[in-house]
Amino acid sequence: MKDTAKSTPSEVNEAPRRHTDINPRGWWRQLPRRLHPYILLARFDRPIGWWLLLLPGWWIIPATATGTGRMVELMMLFLIGAVTTRAAGCVINDLWDRRLDQSVERTAGRPLAAGTIGITAAVIFLGVLGLFGLMILVRLPLAAILTGIAALPLVILYPLAKRVTWWPQAVLGLTFSWGVPLGWAAASLQSTPEWPPAALLAIYAGSVAWVFGYDTIYAVQDMADDRTAGVKSSALGLGRHLKTGVSAAYLLAVLGLGSGFWLLLGPGPWLGGLVLMALHLGWQVRHLNIDDPAGALRLFQSNRDAGLMLTAAMVLTHLAG
């Protein structure tokens, strides 16, 4: 008879796999074993996700906050909020995808897919994360609270996109770029701030294009398994035009961010950060190889550095002003 006993978290993640983004010797192994599946479910062991969620908000806050103290306060709140929100989003994603994840090599070791945590426990954990995130959100102005709540449908529905469209990365872009309108609303002390639509929309569109590009690179890791499992992605949708598609997305990102911040700030130190970011994005495209999943993961992760280049320049622009 087939053994149906569930493996422990450590056993699941020590099982040999050709490719996974879970580090079996990560810091989380020093924690009590009963916490391991929760750490992995929330991706607390892989900070790249919350970095990428955080950065669009970190771009807009220095450009719009009144006073350095307010800028620092908001950036810290957004940091805590990004870690919490990303963790909650991962739980939602894995609840939707637990059966699909079993068919994909990179995700088969995730706690819900591997059976190391139950659905009830995951839902309770999600509730705790949601409550903590709400505690952060209510510290912001009313306009920001309403803007944050407006993002919930995107967070909940994103996992469904890969089932119905070849472009789920575009939906992720809309979701992960929500820090732009949220940061804009949070930086205003008024309940109904004035929104310069052209600048806001250009920056948001640029961020969406950036997310689309880097998550298409991320999807390169799973192309073979996704094709077998019937999961859709922009990497599969673009096919042999993948490099061209990523190049176009990154070009649109630079143009959108550049035009938006120019309308908002005019010339300033931020331009240097955008140039460095653009060079980094070009470097990614040059080294992208669809036959190298591990290399694609490294390129994807390098987008934290690309985004921090612009963040540093935005902070300098704020201080110089």
Q: Model regions: which residues?
A:
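Hydrophobic residues within membrane-embedded alpha-helical segments of Major Facilitator Superfamily
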Residues: 52, 59, 84-85, 129-132, ...
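Membrane-embedded alpha-helical segments that form the functional core of polytopic membrane enzymes
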Residues: 54-96, 106, 127-135, 145-156, ...
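Extended hydrophobic alpha-helices typical of membrane-associated regions
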Residues: 33-36, 255, 262-321
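Intramembrane alpha-helical segments
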Residues: 36-40, 110-195, 202, 259, ...
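Multi-pass membrane catalytic core of lipid/isoprenoid biosynthesis enzymes
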Residues: 54, 76-82, 98-148, 228-267, ...
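Residue-level signal for inorganic ion chemistry
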Residues: 42, 97, 118, 168, ...
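Cytosolic, membrane-interface loops and tails of multi-pass inner-membrane proteins
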Residues: 2, 11-36, 90-117, 215-239, ...
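The first (N-terminal) embedded transmembrane alpha-helix
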Residues: 43-63, 177, 311-313
